[in-house]
A protein has these predicted regions:
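ATP/NTP phosphate-donor binding region
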Residues: 1-59, 66, 70-71, 104
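Catalytic core of DAGKc-family lipid kinases
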Residues: 5-7, 31-39, 74-189
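Short glycine-/acidic-enriched loop or helix-start segments at secondary-structure transitions
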Residues: 17, 67-70, 93-94, 199-200, ...
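Hydrophobic packing residues within well-ordered alpha-helices of enzyme cores
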Residues: 24, 68, 92-93, 139, ...
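Catalytic phosphate-donor-binding core of small-molecule kinases
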Residues: 35, 160-169, 208-256
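Short acidic/glycine-rich loop or secondary-structure boundary segments that cap or lie
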Residues: 137-139, 182-184, 196-199, 223-225
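Glycine-rich phosphate/pyrophosphate-binding beta-alpha loops
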Residues: 189-201
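Conserved small/polar residues in nucleotide/adenosyl-binding loops
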Residues: 270-277
Length: 281
Protein backbone atom coordinates (compact mmCIF):
# COMPACT_ATOMS: atom_id res chain seq x y z
CA UNK A 1 0.00 0.00 0.00
CA UNK A 2 1.32 3.43 -0.93
CA UNK A 3 1.90 5.88 1.90
CA UNK A 4 1.13 9.60 1.90
CA UNK A 5 2.46 12.12 4.41
CA UNK A 6 -0.23 14.79 4.75
CA UNK A 7 1.06 17.98 6.40
CA UNK A 8 -1.14 20.98 7.04
CA UNK A 9 -0.71 24.34 8.74
CA UNK A 10 -3.80 25.09 10.88
CA UNK A 11 -2.79 28.78 11.02
CA UNK A 12 -2.70 29.26 7.24
CA UNK A 13 -5.29 31.42 5.52
CA UNK A 14 -8.38 31.75 7.67
CA UNK A 15 -7.71 28.51 9.55
CA UNK A 16 -10.30 26.50 7.62
CA UNK A 17 -7.92 23.76 6.53
CA UNK A 18 -8.16 21.98 9.89
CA UNK A 19 -11.85 21.36 9.21
CA UNK A 20 -11.13 20.20 5.65
CA UNK A 21 -8.24 17.95 6.70
CA UNK A 22 -10.51 15.09 7.78
CA UNK A 23 -12.33 15.03 4.44
CA UNK A 24 -9.03 15.22 2.54
CA UNK A 25 -7.51 12.42 4.58
CA UNK A 26 -10.53 10.22 3.91
CA UNK A 27 -10.26 10.91 0.16
CA UNK A 28 -6.72 9.54 0.13
CA UNK A 29 -7.71 6.51 2.20
CA UNK A 30 -10.53 5.76 -0.23
CA UNK A 31 -7.97 5.99 -3.05
CA UNK A 32 -5.92 3.24 -1.40
CA UNK A 33 -3.29 5.24 0.46
CA UNK A 34 -2.04 4.64 3.96
CA UNK A 35 -1.98 8.13 5.44
CA UNK A 36 0.13 9.79 8.11
CA UNK A 37 -1.35 13.19 8.83
CA UNK A 38 -1.30 16.02 11.29
CA UNK A 39 -0.51 19.71 11.77
CA UNK A 40 3.08 20.71 11.03
CA UNK A 41 5.38 21.04 14.02
CA UNK A 42 7.73 23.82 12.91
CA UNK A 43 10.22 22.94 15.66
CA UNK A 44 11.22 19.65 13.99
CA UNK A 45 11.82 18.19 10.56
CA UNK A 46 8.52 16.62 9.39
CA UNK A 47 10.47 14.02 7.39
CA UNK A 48 12.08 12.44 10.45
CA UNK A 49 10.96 8.82 10.21
CA UNK A 50 9.10 9.48 6.94
CA UNK A 51 11.94 9.52 4.42
CA UNK A 52 10.45 6.82 2.17
CA UNK A 53 6.82 7.89 1.75
CA UNK A 54 5.38 7.72 -1.77
CA UNK A 55 3.73 11.15 -1.67
CA UNK A 56 3.92 14.31 0.43
CA UNK A 57 0.82 16.52 0.45
CA UNK A 58 1.22 20.01 1.90
CA UNK A 59 -1.81 22.16 2.77
CA UNK A 60 -0.94 25.75 3.57
CA UNK A 61 0.34 28.96 2.04
CA UNK A 62 3.63 29.67 0.27
CA UNK A 63 5.48 29.95 3.58
CA UNK A 64 4.35 26.48 4.63
CA UNK A 65 5.38 25.02 1.27
CA UNK A 66 8.74 26.77 1.60
CA UNK A 67 9.31 25.23 5.02
CA UNK A 68 8.49 21.72 3.82
CA UNK A 69 10.65 21.99 0.68
CA UNK A 70 13.66 23.24 2.68
CA UNK A 71 13.31 20.46 5.24
CA UNK A 72 13.04 17.93 2.39
CA UNK A 73 16.18 19.31 0.70
CA UNK A 74 17.92 19.34 4.07
CA UNK A 75 17.61 15.55 4.08
CA UNK A 76 18.54 15.29 0.37
CA UNK A 77 15.15 13.78 -0.46
CA UNK A 78 13.44 13.93 -3.84
CA UNK A 79 9.86 13.00 -2.97
CA UNK A 80 6.68 13.47 -4.98
CA UNK A 81 5.03 16.65 -3.68
CA UNK A 82 1.40 17.73 -3.89
CA UNK A 83 0.23 21.24 -2.94
CA UNK A 84 -3.20 22.13 -1.53
CA UNK A 85 -3.70 25.93 -1.35
CA UNK A 86 -4.79 26.93 2.14
CA UNK A 87 -2.97 30.22 2.76
CA UNK A 88 -3.72 33.87 2.08
CA UNK A 89 -2.17 34.24 -1.38
CA UNK A 90 -1.14 30.72 -2.51
CA UNK A 91 1.04 32.03 -5.35
CA UNK A 92 2.96 28.79 -5.98
CA UNK A 93 -0.20 26.69 -5.99
CA UNK A 94 -1.61 29.16 -8.51
CA UNK A 95 1.45 28.70 -10.74
CA UNK A 96 0.80 24.95 -10.60
CA UNK A 97 -2.80 25.48 -11.68
CA UNK A 98 -4.32 24.12 -8.48
CA UNK A 99 -7.97 24.55 -7.58
CA UNK A 100 -8.51 27.21 -4.91
CA UNK A 101 -10.88 25.03 -2.89
CA UNK A 102 -8.77 22.64 -0.74
CA UNK A 103 -11.07 19.63 -1.16
CA UNK A 104 -11.24 20.14 -4.93
CA UNK A 105 -7.45 20.53 -4.99
CA UNK A 106 -7.10 17.19 -3.19
CA UNK A 107 -9.28 15.55 -5.85
CA UNK A 108 -7.12 17.22 -8.50
CA UNK A 109 -4.01 15.65 -6.95
CA UNK A 110 -5.58 12.20 -6.92
CA UNK A 111 -6.42 12.48 -10.61
CA UNK A 112 -3.25 14.30 -11.64
CA UNK A 113 0.02 13.38 -13.32
CA UNK A 114 3.59 13.82 -12.12
CA UNK A 115 5.57 16.80 -13.44
CA UNK A 116 8.94 18.29 -12.56
CA UNK A 117 9.15 22.03 -11.87
CA UNK A 118 11.88 24.53 -11.05
CA UNK A 119 12.97 25.68 -7.61
CA UNK A 120 15.07 28.73 -6.77
CA UNK A 121 17.96 28.84 -4.36
CA UNK A 122 19.57 31.86 -2.72
CA UNK A 123 22.81 31.07 -0.91
CA UNK A 124 21.77 28.01 1.12
CA UNK A 125 17.99 28.55 1.16
CA UNK A 126 15.46 27.26 -1.38
CA UNK A 127 12.38 29.15 -2.51
CA UNK A 128 9.44 28.00 -4.62
CA UNK A 129 7.87 31.30 -5.70
CA UNK A 130 9.81 34.49 -4.94
CA UNK A 131 12.87 35.94 -3.24
CA UNK A 132 12.68 39.69 -2.61
CA UNK A 133 13.92 42.72 -0.72
CA UNK A 134 13.14 46.43 -0.53
CA UNK A 135 9.90 48.39 -0.14
CA UNK A 136 6.72 46.31 0.33
CA UNK A 137 8.60 43.01 0.15
CA UNK A 138 8.54 42.27 3.89
CA UNK A 139 4.89 43.33 4.25
CA UNK A 140 3.62 39.76 4.62
CA UNK A 141 6.05 39.13 7.50
CA UNK A 142 4.65 42.07 9.47
CA UNK A 143 0.96 41.53 8.71
CA UNK A 144 -0.72 40.04 11.81
CA UNK A 145 -2.23 36.58 11.26
CA UNK A 146 -5.47 37.75 12.88
CA UNK A 147 -5.86 40.52 10.30
CA UNK A 148 -5.07 38.12 7.43
CA UNK A 149 -7.74 35.76 8.73
CA UNK A 150 -10.27 38.61 8.91
CA UNK A 151 -9.77 40.40 5.59
CA UNK A 152 -7.41 38.23 3.52
CA UNK A 153 -5.17 39.93 0.92
CA UNK A 154 -6.46 43.40 1.85
CA UNK A 155 -4.43 43.07 5.05
CA UNK A 156 -1.22 43.13 2.97
CA UNK A 157 -2.27 46.36 1.26
CA UNK A 158 -3.05 48.10 4.56
CA UNK A 159 0.29 47.07 6.05
CA UNK A 160 2.15 48.02 2.87
CA UNK A 161 0.92 51.63 2.97
CA UNK A 162 2.77 52.07 6.27
CA UNK A 163 6.09 51.42 4.52
CA UNK A 164 6.06 54.77 2.71
CA UNK A 165 7.54 56.31 5.87
CA UNK A 166 10.72 54.22 5.66
CA UNK A 167 11.36 54.02 1.91
CA UNK A 168 15.04 54.16 0.90
CA UNK A 169 17.23 53.34 -2.06
CA UNK A 170 19.44 50.24 -2.07
CA UNK A 171 22.72 50.51 -4.06
CA UNK A 172 23.22 47.25 -5.96
CA UNK A 173 26.02 45.67 -7.96
CA UNK A 174 24.49 42.92 -10.09
CA UNK A 175 25.97 40.15 -12.19
CA UNK A 176 23.23 38.38 -14.18
CA UNK A 177 24.42 35.42 -16.27
CA UNK A 178 27.80 37.14 -16.57
CA UNK A 179 26.43 40.60 -17.45
CA UNK A 180 27.34 43.29 -14.88
CA UNK A 181 25.50 46.51 -14.06
CA UNK A 182 24.91 48.87 -11.11
CA UNK A 183 21.75 50.64 -10.01
CA UNK A 184 19.98 52.03 -6.97
CA UNK A 185 16.78 50.13 -6.37
CA UNK A 186 13.76 50.59 -4.13
CA UNK A 187 12.70 46.98 -4.58
CA UNK A 188 14.00 43.72 -6.05
CA UNK A 189 11.78 40.75 -6.94
CA UNK A 190 13.28 37.47 -8.14
CA UNK A 191 10.52 35.19 -9.40
CA UNK A 192 10.39 31.47 -9.89
CA UNK A 193 6.60 31.80 -10.12
CA UNK A 194 4.65 34.70 -11.62
CA UNK A 195 2.65 36.33 -8.81
CA UNK A 196 3.36 37.98 -5.46
CA UNK A 197 0.49 38.33 -3.02
CA UNK A 198 -1.83 37.46 -5.90
CA UNK A 199 -0.53 40.32 -8.09
CA UNK A 200 0.59 39.29 -11.59
CA UNK A 201 3.97 41.00 -11.64
CA UNK A 202 5.79 38.49 -13.86
CA UNK A 203 3.08 37.07 -16.15
CA UNK A 204 5.59 35.67 -18.66
CA UNK A 205 7.41 33.68 -15.97
CA UNK A 206 7.27 29.89 -15.97
CA UNK A 207 8.11 27.33 -13.30
CA UNK A 208 9.38 24.97 -16.01
CA UNK A 209 11.90 27.04 -17.98
CA UNK A 210 14.93 27.07 -15.66
CA UNK A 211 14.95 30.89 -15.58
CA UNK A 212 14.29 33.62 -13.03
CA UNK A 213 12.16 36.62 -13.96
CA UNK A 214 13.71 39.61 -12.18
CA UNK A 215 12.09 42.98 -11.50
CA UNK A 216 14.03 45.94 -10.11
CA UNK A 217 12.25 49.19 -9.28
CA UNK A 218 14.84 51.92 -9.83
CA UNK A 219 14.90 54.81 -7.39
CA UNK A 220 13.15 58.05 -8.39
CA UNK A 221 10.68 60.16 -6.40
CA UNK A 222 8.10 58.07 -4.56
CA UNK A 223 5.04 59.12 -6.57
CA UNK A 224 6.78 58.35 -9.85
CA UNK A 225 7.85 54.96 -8.47
CA UNK A 226 4.31 54.00 -7.45
CA UNK A 227 2.92 55.09 -10.83
CA UNK A 228 5.61 53.09 -12.63
CA UNK A 229 4.77 49.91 -10.74
CA UNK A 230 1.05 50.41 -11.42
CA UNK A 231 1.84 50.83 -15.12
CA UNK A 232 3.81 47.57 -15.00
CA UNK A 233 0.87 45.79 -13.34
CA UNK A 234 -1.39 47.04 -16.14
CA UNK A 235 0.91 45.63 -18.81
CA UNK A 236 2.98 48.72 -19.57
CA UNK A 237 6.76 48.89 -19.80
CA UNK A 238 7.87 51.85 -17.68
CA UNK A 239 11.60 52.58 -17.88
CA UNK A 240 11.88 52.72 -14.09
CA UNK A 241 10.98 49.00 -13.82
CA UNK A 242 13.93 46.96 -15.06
CA UNK A 243 12.74 43.49 -16.12
CA UNK A 244 15.19 40.81 -17.20
CA UNK A 245 15.60 37.03 -17.11
CA UNK A 246 18.57 35.06 -15.80
CA UNK A 247 19.63 31.64 -14.56
CA UNK A 248 22.13 32.95 -12.00
CA UNK A 249 22.46 36.21 -10.09
CA UNK A 250 25.18 37.69 -7.92
CA UNK A 251 24.01 40.75 -6.00
CA UNK A 252 26.17 42.87 -3.70
CA UNK A 253 25.11 45.87 -1.61
CA UNK A 254 26.70 47.94 1.18
CA UNK A 255 23.32 47.78 2.95
CA UNK A 256 22.47 44.71 5.02
CA UNK A 257 18.90 44.65 3.74
CA UNK A 258 16.15 42.42 5.24
CA UNK A 259 14.93 39.83 2.74
CA UNK A 260 11.87 37.68 2.18
CA UNK A 261 11.46 34.18 0.76
CA UNK A 262 7.95 33.06 -0.13
CA UNK A 263 6.42 35.51 2.33
CA UNK A 264 8.68 34.51 5.22
CA UNK A 265 11.51 36.37 6.94
CA UNK A 266 14.95 35.40 5.66
CA UNK A 267 18.55 36.25 6.48
CA UNK A 268 19.78 39.78 5.69
CA UNK A 269 22.56 39.80 3.09
CA UNK A 270 25.20 42.18 1.78
CA UNK A 271 26.10 39.58 -0.86
CA UNK A 272 23.92 36.86 -2.27
CA UNK A 273 24.05 34.34 -5.06
CA UNK A 274 20.78 33.08 -6.50
CA UNK A 275 20.47 30.33 -9.05
CA UNK A 276 17.55 28.54 -10.64
CA UNK A 277 17.58 24.76 -10.24
CA UNK A 278 15.68 23.45 -13.24
CA UNK A 279 13.20 20.60 -12.68
CA UNK A 280 14.36 20.30 -9.06
CA UNK A 281 10.95 19.46 -7.59
Amino acid sequence: MKQVLFLYNPQSGKGKIEKDSQAIGEMFRQAGYSIVDGPIDFSRNPFNGHETVDLVVVAGGDGTVNYVVNRMKEKHLDLLLGIIPAGTANDFAGALGMEKNPVKAAAQLLGGTEERVDCGRVNDHYFVNIFSFGIFTTTSQRTPDKRKHQIGKLAYLIEGVKEFRSVHGIPLQILADGKAFDLESLMALIFNGETAGGFHLAPRSSIKDGMFDCLLLQRRNMLFSVVSMLRHLLGGRPSQVKHFRARTLDITSPINEPTDVDGQKAVSYTHLRAHETKANL
